[in-house]
Amino acid sequence: MALFSEDLPAQQFEFDPTKSAENFHKHGIDFEAAQRLWDDAKLLELPARTTDEARWLVIAVLDGKHWSAIITRREQRIRLISVRRAREEEKALYESEEF
């Protein structure tokens, strides 16, 4: 089931600052900037395929570019795990009329 940003309350974020810096070096976006993904009214949040903790794939547009984030929820906070440019199939899902 996809969730849209308007279905969610105001978000609070947490992340590892070292991992944020590594993410910037690898993918060109840090976790401070990535929080703006939640400003996208069309943001999609889908269950990620994981076997350990519950994780979510978030697809949104920021500054005209599609991004994908992996997150987990801890109490009332969103923990950012990684953010990268969206893959073609993720872009297609975001742009599809199914949601």
Language model segments and positions:
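Ribonuclease/tRNase effector modules and their secretory precursors
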Residues: 1-99
